[in-house]
Curated annotation (Swiss-Prot):
Protein name (record): Glutamine synthetase
Cofactor note: Binds 2 Mn(2+) ions per subunit.
Residues where ATP binds: 208, 272-274, 340, 345, 353
Enzyme class: ligase
């Protein structure tokens, strides 16, 4: 879509406002809204100035001016605002050079795709992420000097089997780890997910399926079709926006926290990916599980750099409450056909054209632009340096005897470990100027602040364990 087409849309849809959106370092969408009459052809060349010092991990107050540069191809009508509003996604540019800001996640993703093409290895990378989420009826939490608390409730929660409701308790709720694929009334979110699908398609996503997920208390997934990397990261931001707002309309609250509840499955964001050149799938070949040698090297790069990738793909302290054995969490850095206990799976496909790999450790708290770019850069490093991943592991890795299990590397066990790994293993990200040291250092500092706060805050479980010592 061109700027000319956007200007036509403004008239055809009688648009009153234009909502300029961008993504901060942590992955949260931000926006500023302007009257539609301010948008003309020059707007798409000049952009809009804003204060970059107010975004965590970005500019200092002494050099705060930055440019929001609209990408006309992303224009879409907002389905939620009362007044007709057009959303346009923006890149963050330096005002002096009009080059992409080195800490802007979307600019980083675009540089990664440019680097892919510059290597000559491939011209396209396709991503198919699968973010999961919870829908709750009520959530209360807080942390202050006088104490900490969190309380989750949902009518689907297994703990509500004996709860007294005004209209009676109707039962029909999924048990712990019992939520995968039941029909209503056990699956209480059917209509909510259907509405999410309709709105997502209205906003340009292609929906393939939706269903209840494994956990009790409203764990769900909407599956959407793959796309090229930056476009798919854009779509993940739309996906989250739709899930949050449709849930809100239904009187629910949605969360993409990786592990909101102890004792049941957490939410992942498995990432399917493949490389293509001139329309040919480069991951299809005659090696293990129908993969090419390039695909194996790509896997080798992801495994080699996995702990550094964790800092971007599993970016919260909560992420590592999911990455523990026993809850379908892919902690073992191995690859296998069909085997879901491995961190990298090769799905069964109907055609060699669909051959791909699935990296299973990322979670939906990740900034999609940074997560996808890191996975791509690790894979390209594997191809360039011919890093073979070793033999495939086709056995259930959760059932291995301890002496065998300790020989298999694992993902990072904490955010601190992941950030330390990123600090020491960053050169693969800097190839082609995709990530800079400044961007990586700022990211690490931002996440260490969160890690320090969690580490220093007394936890309710500590009172259970230690109050009476």
């Amino acid at each position: 879509m061109s700027a000319e087409h956007v200007l036509t849309m403004l008239n055809e849809h009688e648009v009153k406002f234009v909502d300029l959106r961008f993504t901060d370092t942590k992955g949260k969408e931000q926006h500023v809204t302007i009257p539609a009459h301010q948008v003309n052809a020059e707007f798409f060349e000049e952009g809009k100035m804003f204060d970059g010092s107010s975004i965590g991990g970005w500019k200092g107050i002494n050099e705060s001016d930055m440019v929001l540069m609209p990408d006309a191809s992303t224009a879409v009508i907002d389905p939620f605002f009362a007044d007709s509003t057009l959303i346009i996604r923006c890149d963050i540019l330096e005002p002096g050079t009009l080059q992409g800001y080195d800490r802007d996640p979307r600019s980083i993703a675009k540089r990664a795709e440019d680097y892919l093409r510059a290597t000559g290895i491939a011209d396209t990378v396709l991503f198919g992420p699968e973010p999961e989420f919870f829908l709750f009826d009520d959530i209360r939490f807080g942390a202050s000097i006088s104490g900490s608390h969190v309380a989750i409730d949902d009518i689907e929660g297994a703990w509500n089997s004996s709860t007294k409701y005004e209209g009676g308790n109707k039962g029909h709720r999924p048990g712990v780890k019992g939520g995968y694929f039941p029909v209503p009334p056990v699956d209480s979110a059917q209509d909510i997910r259907s509405e999410m699908c309709l709105v997502m398609e209205q906003m340009g996503l292609v929906v393939e399926a939706h269903h209840h997920e494994v956990a009790t208390a409203g764990q769900n997934e909407v599956a959407t079709r793959f796309n090229t990397m930056t476009k798919k990261a854009d779509e993940i931001q739309i996906y989250k926006y739709v899930v949050h707002n449709v849930a809100h309309r239904f009187g629910k609250t949605a969360t993409f926290m990786p592990k909101p509840m102890f004792g049941d499955n957490g939410s992942g964001m498995h990432c399917h990916m493949s490389l293509a050149k001139n329309g040919t799938n480069l991951f299809s070949g005659d090696k293990y599980a129908g993969l090419s040698e390039q695909a194996l090297y790509y896997i080798g790069g992801v495994i080699k750099h996995a702990k550094a990738i964790n800092a971007l793909a599993n970016p919260t302290t909560n992420s590592y409450k999911r990455l523990v054995p026993g809850y379908e969490a892919p902690v073992m850095l191995a690859y296998s056909a069909r085997n879901r206990s491995a961190s990298i799976r090769i799905p069964v496909v109907a055609s060699p054209k669909a051959r791909r790999i699935e990296v299973r450790f990322p979670d939906p708290a990740a900034n999609p632009y940074l997560c996808f770019a890191a996975l791509l850069m690790a894979g390209l490093d594997g191809i360039k340096n011919k890093i073979h991943p070793g033999e495939a592991m086709d056995k259930n890795l959760y059932d291995l005897p301890p002496e065998e299990a300790k020989e298999i590397p694992q993902v990072a066990g904490s955010l601190e470990e992941a950030l330390n790994a990123l600090d020491l293993d960053r050169e693969f990200l800097k190839a082609g100027g995709v990530f800079t040291d400044e961007a990586i250092d700022a990211y690490i500092a931002l996440r260490r602040e969160e890690d320090d706060r969690v580490r220093m805050t007394p936890h309710p479980v500590e009172f259970e364990l230690y109050y009476s010592v």
